[in-house]
């Protein structure tokens, strides 16, 4: 079975069984309180990383983040599948601790990891109710976490546990909601939906709030789509460009620039859309 076919199968199974993974959310939503409500030059969102730490570090260098003028939100799914999930988590943690205007959300893979750890700890490879995490790329994360000193692994796990599942800010009176997967138009603020939802969100959301998401690779949303972020007409910005897929990228989207451009009222050109994005390619991509 090819990589894309295996991805589709795992994604399908993962979606069906997602509600087996219950995380007690300590923080449902974070707001732009650190920034004091001021206007940011750039409002940035980084899509799914999935253990591609080297690629993320190259992307970070391209972004040239400025804490005095920028806001940046990591959209979750730092772990699993790629070669360096623990180093990816550590990198994200360092940025949130170093910069007041960098925020990191929880993704569904982090939620699966926490459910597994809460059920079994890190010392054993259990194949049972929670083996879906291991089957969806969690084995390398479990192995690397288990290799850390106990105190270090516990601290990193606690960092993950404290991630909010959404973040809100605004730009020139337009509300912006950052979540990993999306929102359910029929059920407001359900944590599971914010981590897991796919089709119902993309087909059913028509709200006034701009919703910025990862989770679903843009290559999966449109069959002919290149690995680039999508700016959809129903106020959705899709940032996951399939970091671990054969043609994948890690993408950073400047949401503020996109909103400024679309206020002109004309249909954005491909060049204008591209000007809202920075990307890095995994070495094996």
Enumerate the predicted regions with their spans.
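Methionine residue identity
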Residues: 1-6
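Residue-level marker for buried hydrophobic side chains located in beta-strands
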Residues: 45, 72-74, 104-105, 177, ...
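Short N-terminal helix/helix-N-cap motif within the alpha/beta-hydrolase-1
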Residues: 54, 82-87, 114, 187-188, ...
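Active-site neighborhood of divalent metal-dependent phosphoester bond hydrolases
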Residues: 81-167
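Acidic, His/Gly-enriched loop-helix segments that form or flank divalent-metal centers
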Residues: 132-238, 242-248, 258-268
């Amino acid at each position: 079975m090819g990589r894309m076919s295996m991805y589709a199968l795992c994604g399908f199974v993962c979606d069906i069984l997602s509600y087996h993974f219950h995380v007690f959310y300590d923080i449902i939503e974070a707001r732009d309180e650190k920034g004091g409500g001021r206007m940011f030059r750039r409002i940035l969102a980084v899509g799914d990383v999935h253990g591609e730490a080297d690629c993320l570090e190259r992307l970070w260098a391209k972004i040239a983040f400025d804490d005095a003028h920028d806001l940046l939100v990591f959209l979750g799914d730092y772990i699993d599948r790629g070669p360096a999930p623990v180093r990816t988590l550590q990198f994200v943690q360092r940025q949130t601790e170093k910069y007041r205007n960098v925020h990191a959300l929880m993704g569904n893979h982090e939620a699966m990891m926490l459910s597994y750890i809460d059920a079994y700890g890190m010392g054993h490879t259990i194949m049972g109710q929670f083996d879906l995490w291991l089957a969806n790329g969690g084995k390398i994360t479990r192995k690397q976490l288990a290799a850390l000193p106990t105190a270090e692994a516990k601290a990193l796990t606690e960092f993950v546990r404290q991630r909010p599942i959404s973040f809100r800010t605004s730009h020139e009176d337009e509300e912006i909601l950052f979540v990993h997967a999306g929102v359910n138009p029929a059920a407001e603020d359900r944590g599971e939906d914010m981590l897991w939802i796919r089709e119902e969100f993309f087909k059913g959301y028509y709200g006034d709030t701009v919703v910025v998401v990862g989770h679903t690779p843009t290559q999966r949303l449109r069959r002919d789509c290149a690995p680039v972020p999508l700016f959809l007409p129903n106020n959705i910005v899709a940032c996951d460009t399939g970091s671990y897929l054969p043609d994948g990228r890690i993408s950073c989207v400047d949401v503020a620039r996109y909103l400024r451009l679309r206020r002109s009222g004309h249909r954005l050109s491909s060049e204008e859309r591209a000007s809202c994005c920075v990307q890095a390619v995994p070495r094996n991509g």
